[in-house]
Amino acid sequence: MNWKNFVCSVVCLAGMTCAEAVNYTPENVSASIALKVPGNDAKRYPLTLQQLDNSNFEYQWVAADKLPVVIYQNVEEKDGNQRIVIFMTALDDVYFNFGEQVMTGCHHDDCLFYMPGFWYRRNLRSPQEAPSFHTSDSWLVREDRLSTPLTAIFDEKNRKTYSVIRLDNMASDALTTHKEGEVILSGKTSIGYTGFENLSGIASLSFGFPYKEAPKTYIRKLTLAPSVEAYQLLRKGESLSLTWELHESEIADFSECVQHIWEYSYDTNCPQIVNTPYSPEKMKEVMSNFFVESFVGNTPTHYYSGVELRTATCDQTDVAEVGFVGRTLLNAFNALEYGEQQRRTDLVTNAYKIFDSYLQHCF
């Protein structure tokens, strides 16, 4: 036997994460549907998951009251994961918002959370005016806020990761007349929501359709606004299908959790290169015009004017900023590097003017 290959195999196996299915049972899941008549407050109906026999569907979500919509569900095993497929048919015209929660069995206080591009651990390094545990330990957000429509929960104590990802095609969105509260969509959207919630001390994965954001919505930098919940019209006889996938893995630490989730997301979504009409070289050439049009050289310290820029006129302003938005010195370095590569003496000259002015006059 080739001992070198054997040892390599053992090392590779030791480094692999162990994927297994989330324990999706009626005892671990809950759901509700909110129905709204325009002009009136929505009414939320708790749903119970009932197993079906002699049917094309495994389960049906039912309420204590008769609803103008029927909701069926299948749970499919796929590569060690569980796919949740919802089938919804309207018996009458109805505006709805559907949500589901899957309890992980982990104590919420033992968990860290990850939503790609939006949430890391508990977001405690973010200001109180941004989404974080400073405001709440439970957050639901629109899927299109994230790099991929996924939420992951990492149990530090038991070293396991649980995640939910939306698998439907995100192809459309619709406008609303309001930005908070219960809002009626002007058309059809494909945007749902994802997040995590503390349910009586247990961490749960939460997801649904159409979107909602709670306990706050993050409308702009450092600005939390009241929650929003969208309602989409499903006309009588229309049907809707929604698909999510639940995934569970044994993970050593949170860093490995992030790595694993990204690899899982790529494997699941299989992103393809986007074909664009312009090459990277062409776009860099166009964007480099910023260094020309925004250069201000009639002040003691020279800079690129970009802070508080009015997009309607693109006029230069008298605001210079070294960090955050302005990044004058970083932009000067970028202009210098690009200018030298492209033999653009105008970019190189202005970049050195900025550096020299700061060396002479300081900040």
Where are the model-predicted features located?
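Well-ordered alpha-helical scaffold segments within catalytic/enzyme domains
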Residues: L329-T345
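Beta-strand/loop-rich accessory regions of lumenal/periplasmic or secreted enzymes
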Residues: N23-V29, K36-D41, T48-K236
